[in-house]
């Protein structure tokens, strides 16, 4: 899929849902590619989890690292379903997509696939738009995000939180766009990614 097609597929349509955390996700094999997407904030519970920005250690790792507690909880609630999709589906590549809160979850999904399935590392790519920071500053796992491409608009406030002084960082490569709207147009700046893809 081209980026604009991925945007359309990854932001619309029907979703699977974990009721406990209200995490919406979907996956589909198209032309031998397993596409996985996570929906952005869509409910009060989503917003509560966005603001659950304390860091939690990612458990059962030799190399301890920390992640955004709200996004980690959402990711863990759907991890098994994504694992089943990887086991059950036939594919040659994996492409993960997320927008806004979905980008935070997609970042954790990317890391999990990279760590859990070494044979998929060269076949894995992730595109996130309007992603908040997800990973703790002192987490030494940057190499796990070589194939993660972030799209950010300079004036998009969502890409600035949690703030760097809270010891969070972005991961992956960044494709930055100036944006067409004044800084105070918060919603317009955040929703404008489709204009650049």
Q: What is the predicted function of each stretch?
A:
Residues 1-97, 101-197:
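Non-catalytic, mobile gating and regulatory segments of ester bond hydrolases
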């Amino acid at each position: 899929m081209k980026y604009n097609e991925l945007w359309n597929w990854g932001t619309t349509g029907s979703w699977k849902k974990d009721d406990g955390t209200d995490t919406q996700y979907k996956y589909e094999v198209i032309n031998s590619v397993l596409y996985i997407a996570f929906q952005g904030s869509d409910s009060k519970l989503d917003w509560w989890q966005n603001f659950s920005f304390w860091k939690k250690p990612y458990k059962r790792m030799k190399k301890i690292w920390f992640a955004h507690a709200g996004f980690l909880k959402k990711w863990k609630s759907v991890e098994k379903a994504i694992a089943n999709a990887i086991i059950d589906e036939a594919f040659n590549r994996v492409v993960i997509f997320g927008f806004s809160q979905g980008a935070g979850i997609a970042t954790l999904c990317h890391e999990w696939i990279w760590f859990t399935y070494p044979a998929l590392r060269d076949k894995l790519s992730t595109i996130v738009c309007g992603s908040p920071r997800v990973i703790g500053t002192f987490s030494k796992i940057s190499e796990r995000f070589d194939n993660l491409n972030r799209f950010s608009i300079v004036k998009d406030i969502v890409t600035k939180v949690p703030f760097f002084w809270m010891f969070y960082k972005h991961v992956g490569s960044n494709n930055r766009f100036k944006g067409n709207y004044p800084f105070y147009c918060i919603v317009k700046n955040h929703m404008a990614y489709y204009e650049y893809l």
